[in-house]
Amino acid sequence: MKMKQWWLMLSLLASLFLAACKDTDEYTVDPRTNFEALWKILDENYCFFEYKQVDWDEVHDRYSAQLTDTMNQFALFDLMGEMLAELKDGHTNLYSSFDVARYWDWYQDYPPNFYDDLNELYLGKDYKIAGGLKYKKMHNDQIGYIRYASFSSGIGETNLDYVLYHFKDCKALIIDVRDNGGGVLTYSDRFASRFTEEQVLKGYIQHKTGKGHQDFSEPYPVYLEPTSYICWLRPVVVLTNRYCYSAANDFVQTMRIFPQVTIMGDKTGGGSGLPFNSELPNGWQVRFSACPMLDPDKKLTEFGIDPDIQVEITEEDLARGVDTIIESAILYLQGIIDKDQ
């Protein structure tokens, strides 16, 4: 199934899903009514209960026991946020007019392995900008470096053509998506399509078919189409850390399929559930993972993708203004360049 066909189908599914999820109760701020509505929405539609081995009934009973009829909205919000945190899911949030409940332990409990000030030293002042990409030549102009900080920042086909043409005399490429928390999946596919000359199976996707925790459709194949523009088949290293999430995780998953690509750095943060939104009777919004996305082996990457080569920034290098991960990528690519000469 081609990507455009799949996303059209997915949009239709989303419309049906949102219609089904919309709570029919009238507006109310009653704590128990809203608590039960939130629990039920997740119970019937969240996609990772079995994978994460979460006993949602037990979670319900534990948090329900803490409810009181006189609980104010702030205490209720905190309680609901704590309940959602049991899912350990960066795509699952509760939104009110005064706060956003979020789970960030998936990256905050790990070494950063990326520092903005350090990256600015490597970019210098003479880098170029094309859409959401910053890019320059490194290592005596032998290696191209691309920094993509967020898949929420757009990249067009013309942007990518200019970038890759700029590197036409380079022998290899570094793509740095560390600290990229995700964004638009279309940009992930558009970028990744520049590294293949043929259609590739990038993975599978499922949707809920019922209210049970294991009620899913059969996995639908999702293919990445090759670009009709400039294509790069020379060696590539993609740099990762734990803050690579959602669309960035998807990009890493796709890039690791290609034979000329090596993933280097730290394990990604994951985020392989396509999120949807629903509404509670008091008007609060809830976002959660609803459709699992699988890799070509039909495995989930919700908890992250291991790099091909594990590298972390050392304290000694950081003190000297050296990015251990970039330097390791340069050394690795130089070895390939020397071997090919």
Identify the function of each model-found stretch.
Residues 8, 12, 46-47, 168, ...:
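Proline-centered flexible-loop/turn and helix-kink motifs
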Residues 328-336:
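C-terminal alpha-helix
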Residues 97-99, 308, 323:
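Juxtamembrane/interface motifs at transmembrane-helix termini
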